[in-house]
Amino acid sequence: MPRYLIERSVPGLSPEDLNAAGRRSVAALATMPDVRWIRSYISDAEGKIFCEYDAPSVEAVHEHARRAGLPVDRITEVNLEISPEMFV
């Protein structure tokens, strides 16, 4: 299944907002069994969330965001994961 990185602008995101967004995301995922949220990273300094998802298509990622009421700035499909251990 393709893997995607999603960039979201969320300036001024409070802990309560983050909790609500996470709950909406999980609820949307419950209706979309082919979409899987892997993890997210938050940059308070930039007002961004960077999310990692597995999904059958870019359209499925957009549909999840729509159902969850989440912004999407950019979606990038990634196809190779590397780590420092690979080069030792």
Region spans (language model):
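Short S/T/G/P-rich N-terminal loop/turn motif that feeds into the first structured element of a domain
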Residues: 1-31, 43, 80-88
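Short, well-ordered beta-strand segments in beta-rich or mixed alpha/beta enzyme
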Residues: 4-8, 38-64
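Short amphipathic alpha-helical patches
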Residues: 49-52, 73, 84-88
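A short linear hydrophobic-aromatic micro-motif
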Residues: 34-40, 74
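An amphipathic, aromatic/His-enriched active-site/gating alpha helix that lines ligand/cofactor pockets
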Residues: 55-81
